[in-house]
């Protein structure tokens, strides 16, 4: 039986890509294309089992509350999740057993692997900084991917008992050292011609390591989204990060 899929934000750039990707499979059935002017009841009426959400930070929580309370699992690429929002999603899931929610800062497999590799490398280097580069229409900075990457690096450093990074800066223009994410500097670039890119730079005595990832178009997100749709039934509750669905 094909998995019945609905797409929220279906007329957006990423949404259109996901619609095309689902239609190009044999094991998934697109049953609902919902945009901001449409009623969410279309998801229930169509029998959607899994919803893909690429909407806006202002809309996503209402979308998730509706889906979870109606027994529909959700694969979410929308940004804007902080700890309070994640806690709310966990609460909704706890009241609706069997529903799965996958929230991923990035669905590009190369970006997911960058985050995993960065965490693995973190304990071997004194210093680490993250640079993310995106198109100028992106609403948030730094990106969720960069934040997630920095948090993983910081956690790995804590687990290894490492001290704070060396940095003798005493005078700096506001923002020149980037945002501080758990002690890891994160720098955001917004530039025409870019889509989604990230570089993680590590340094220690006499050597550096750069892990770099590039998404050149939005088709890069589709394979990861399809992984989420196909596997979410085996992951009830909230999962943050596509890496938990991959055999790494």
Swiss-Prot record:
PROSITE patterns linked to this entry: DAPB
Give the protein's function. Catalyzes the conversion of 4-hydroxy-tetrahydrodipicolinate (HTPA) to tetrahydrodipicolinate.
Q: Which InterPro entries match?
A: DapB_C (IPR022663), DapB_N (IPR000846), DapB_N_CS (IPR022664), DHDPR_bac (IPR023940), NAD(P)-bd_dom_sf (IPR036291)
Q: Where in the cell is it found?
A: Cytoplasm
- What name has this protein been given in UniProt? 4-hydroxy-tetrahydrodipicolinate reductase
Give binding positions for (S)-2,3,4,5-tetrahydrodipicolinate.
135, 144-145
Keyword NADP annotated: yes
Q: Does the keyword NADP apply?
A: yes
EC numbers: 1.17.1.8
Tree of life domain: Bacteria
User: So where's the catalytic machinery, residue-wise?
Assistant: 134, 138
One Pfam family name is DapB_N
Keyword vocabulary terms for this entry: Amino-acid biosynthesis, Cytoplasm, Diaminopimelate biosynthesis, Lysine biosynthesis, NAD, NADP, Oxidoreductase
Tell me which family the UniProt entry assigns to this protein. Belongs to the DapB family.
- Coiled coil, from the record: none
Pathway connected to this protein: Amino-acid biosynthesis; L-lysine biosynthesis via DAP pathway; (S)-tetrahydrodipicolinate from L-aspartate: step 4/4
Catalysis: reaction(s): (S)-2,3,4,5-tetrahydrodipicolinate + NAD(+) + H2O = (2S,4S)-4-hydroxy-2,3,4,5-tetrahydrodipicolinate + NADH + H(+); (S)-2,3,4,5-tetrahydrodipicolinate + NADP(+) + H2O = (2S,4S)-4-hydroxy-2,3,4,5-tetrahydrodipicolinate + NADPH + H(+)
């Amino acid at each position: 039986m094909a998995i019945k899929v609905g797409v929220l934000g279906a007329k957006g750039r990423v949404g259109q890509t996901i619609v095309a990707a689902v239609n190009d499979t044999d094991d998934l059935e697109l049953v609902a294309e919902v945009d901001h002017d449409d009623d969410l009841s279309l998801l229930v009426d169509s029998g959607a089992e899994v919803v893909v959400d690429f909407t806006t930070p202002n809309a996503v929580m209402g979308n998730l509350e509706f889906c979870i309370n109606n027994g529909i699992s959700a694969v979410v690429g929308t940004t804007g999740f902080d700890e309070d929002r994640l806690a709310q999603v966990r609460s909704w899931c706890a009241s609706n057993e069997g529903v799965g929610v996958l929230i991923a800062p990035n669905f590009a497999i190369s970006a997911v692997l960058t985050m995993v590799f960065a965490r693995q490398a973190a304990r071997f280097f004194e210093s680490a900084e993250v640079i993310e580069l995106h198109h100028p229409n992106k609403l948030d900075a730094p990106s969720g991917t960069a934040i997630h990457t920095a948090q993983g690096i910081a956690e790995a450093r804590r687990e290894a008992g490492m001290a704070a990074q060396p940095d003798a800066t005493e005078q700096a223009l506001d923002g020149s050292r980037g945002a501080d994410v758990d002690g890891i500097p994160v720098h955001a670039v917004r530039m025409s011609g870019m889509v989604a890119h990230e570089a993680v730079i590590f340094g220690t005595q006499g050597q550096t390591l750069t892990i770099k990832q590039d998404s050149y178009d939005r088709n890069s997100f589709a394979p990861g989204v399809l992984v989420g749709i196909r596997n979410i039934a085996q992951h009830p509750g909230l999962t943050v990060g596509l890496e938990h669905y991959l055999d790494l």
